[in-house]
């Protein structure tokens, strides 16, 4: 839990002296959906938290943060308004932007929400036994990720580079949601045999993000290994992702510890540990 102290201790004397323009883009994993306190100046529909990974990074490094991440965003929302009062996310990027972080891709084609909802619905028909979701949907989710989500992420990253040519761009994968094999029905209402199936879908999504980063010169922030054992089936003091039961503000999303882990991982991978400049 040392990561909590790292990001809740306020700004530090060792942080960078000159403010550096830092822009955070993306979806609900990036915005810290459901984590209080919310950012009062952000559009309420974006569910942006003061404890999301970008705010953690900015606090430690004393960067000048422009956070336009928004819950529900997909790659099309980089170029068009997501909803009234929410500008295209690419509008936040400028030539003097030095760092860009983001999570994106999971909401394209509703892959993230749809796979979980459909598998939960299927599990209810078998009381959590067997693999009804896999039998019903087979390779359809992974095929969609590879044929549509992946090129969408590539285009989004290319657009980011075009708008912020002088920035380091880092895109994170999604934290592990389920254990490797054994689930926790009905806390996470996924049938026992569909746990590996959903893990395969998440692995395909993270791999699409990784490949897109490699193709566009962005840095991929891998969180799969470090989040093993901290999935939504773990105890409240161990999990980094919240379960569906009991009801909470943002199920199947990172809690504030998970966001802190994402922040620390970004700093480590980018070589921006405490006191190290960009």
Where do the language-model regions lie?
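Secretory targeting and sorting signals
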Residues: 1-16
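Serine-esterase "nucleophile elbow" of acetyl-processing enzymes
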Residues: 16-71, 119-124
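Structural recognition of the beta-strand scaffold that forms the well-ordered cores
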Residues: 21-26, 30-32, 64-69, 98-103, ...
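Oxyanion-hole/transition-state-stabilizing segment in secreted/luminal serine hydrolases
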Residues: 33, 83-145, 176
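A structural motif corresponding to the C-terminal end of an alpha-helix
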Residues: 56-64, 151-169, 204-222
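Charged, often glycine-rich, active-site loop that binds/positions anionic groups
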Residues: 73-90, 234-246
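A taxonomically broad motif for mature regions of secreted/extracellular
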Residues: 109, 124, 150, 198, ...
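Catalytic His-Asp segment of secreted/periplasmic serine-dependent ester chemistry enzymes
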Residues: 174-277
